Amino acid sequence: MKNKVVNSRIRCLIAFCIPVLIICICFICLGITPFGDKTVLIWDAKLQHKDYYGYLWDVLHGKASLQYSAGKSLGGRMIGIIGFYIGSPLNIVLYFFKKTQIAEFMAFMVILRIGLSAVTSHYYLLKRFQLDLLPALLISTSYAMMEYNIYYSRNNMWLDGVIILPIVALGVW
């Protein structure tokens, strides 16, 4: 039993590393931060999300309130922003970045979320279909690298749904 658990963890680690390596190579080739001067901040990420993450950074460091912000339009409750944009438990990682490193944080979160989507899909394939290592790695890497993930990496909060979907499917099964 112990060998089965260790084997499962190693398989999930490999499933995590493959798409992370692919994304890092792409970021290096394209010169995207942290490997270059370009960022993942385009469209909504540039116009809205970086400010939301700046607010979250302030909250995590005790400089702002979770409930209200005077910086929201003319001031207002923040529950909608938190629930829709920045409420992911993964965003706690922002605490370890400087406020000036929001672009780096967002790039890191794209990499992390894509890797985690591979892990959850690999785990699903392992438990649901008992696939061998190679087919499961190919399918989980394909799942992690699908166009939806790449396209919506600019709105990385949507990637949380891709991470959780295989777990939900496993629960339904």
Which functions belong to the PLM regions below?
Residues H122-A144:
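Transmembrane-helix signature of polytopic, membrane-embedded enzymes
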Residues M1-I32:
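Start-transfer (signal-anchor) and selected internal transmembrane alpha helices
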Residues L13-C17, F108, L137-T141:
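Hydrophobic alpha-helical transmembrane segments
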Residues V162-W173:
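Specific aromatic-rich, kink-prone transmembrane helix
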Residues M1-N7, K127-L131, W173:
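Membrane-interface junctions at the ends of membrane-embedded or membrane-associated helices
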Residues I23-S121, T141-I163:
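Membrane-interface coil-to-helix junctions
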Residues P89, L125, V172:
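Hydrophobic/aromatic pocket-lining and membrane-interface residues
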